[in-house]
UniProtKB/Swiss-Prot annotation:
It comes from Aeropyrum pernix (strain ATCC 700893 / DSM 11879 / JCM 9820 / NBRC 100138 / K1). One of its GO terms (cellular component) is cytoplasm. PROSITE patterns: RADICAL_SAM (PS51918). The keyword Transmembrane does not apply. This is Lipoyl synthase. The gene is lipA. Gene3D superfamilies: Aldolase class I.
């Protein structure tokens, strides 16, 4: 039987309305809306948002994702500044950037990502910036361009276990390729993060193995969440994990050495992002290192 998404009672407060109006007014997009994120009211209600840059149309066809697929529009050269203006107007001290895949662009959009980070830093130097990036087809120089742009956190999701990757993700993605992206980012000295969706048909032992693989390339922050089928066009849910199973996996992750583990059915990559980043920084400081993990 397909797992049903929990029904939540939410309150739309003034902060939510402020974010919604500002985002619409500047013509910038958020993944909160585009991917039907279950935490939209929580995050927007706290005056935070994850901005989706480079359009709303993805060049890939991952079988779990609700984001529109097709031929994207050309990039908006003013978008980095529009996003920076939105971040400044909202007074955010932590912002997450993400995007669709743009395999139609020579660098996959890496330079656009970097320009957006720099634009934010020019207006708000103390704002912590996280970028949840595509794999840029595994091209090392493109990953390094974003990782060295001045951000604090680089996230890239492996999404699922190695065995299911060909079924779940687009054929141009790769499990080992994604691990290498995270390894390159860590070489640039930034905090790294990755997420795994549970309930796509994996065994728990495969999840633990994927967690070990992430630690082997130095990933600091792990996010585990339940897969919910956005529509009948996506893969069905194979299993619904219990809260106790999430707690068990979180405990295993902490024992493996992750600085922070977000494990909850409704968790997404940007959920509790600031809290997770600060935990990673505290770990580095406790070990006698610098600011970055």
């Amino acid at each position: 039987m397909e797992a049903a998404k929990p029904r939540l009672r939410v309150r739309i407060n003034d902060s939510y309305v402020k974010v919604a109006r500002l985002v619409a007014g500047l013509g910038v997009a958020t993944v909160c809306e585009g991917a039907l994120c279950p935490n939209i009211f929580t995050c927007w209600g706290e005056g935070t948002a994850t901005f989706m840059i480079m359009g709303d149309t993805c060049t890939r066809g991952c079988r779990f994702c609700y984001v529109k697929k097709g031929v994207p529009e050309p990039l908006d050269p003013l978008e980095p500044y529009k996003v920076a203006l939105a971040v400044d107007a909202l007074g955010l001290d932590y912002v997450t950037l993400t995007s669709v895949d743009r395999d139609d662009l020579p660098d996959g959009g890496a330079s656009h990502f970097a320009a957006t980070v720099r634009a934010i830093k020019r207006l708000r130097p103390d704002t912590i910036v996280e970028a949840l990036i595509p794999d840029f087809q595994g091209v090392e120089e493109h990953v390094r361009l974003v990782a060295a742009s001045g951000l604090e956190v680089l996230a890239h999701n492996i999404e699922t276990v190695e065995r299911l990757t060909p079924l779940v993700r687009d054929r141009r993605a790769g499990y080992r390729q994604s691990l290498r992206v995270l390894e390159i980012a860590k070489e640039e000295g930034v905090v790294t993060k990755s997420s795994i969706l549970l309930g796509l048909g994996e065994d728990k032992s495969e999840v633990i193995e994927a967690m070990r693989d992430l630690r082997s390339v130095g990933v600091d922050i792990l996010v585990l969440s339940q897969y919910y089928r956005p529509s009948r066009k996506q893969l069905p849910v194979a299993k619904r994990y219990s809260l106790s199973e999430f707690r068990e996996l979180a405990e295993k992750g902490l024992r493996m050495g992750f600085a922070y583990v977000v494990a909850h059915p409704l968790a997404r990559t940007s959920f509790k992002a600031k809290e997770a980043y600060l935990a990673a920084v505290r770990r580095v400081e406790a070990e006698g290192g610098g600011r970055r993990a």
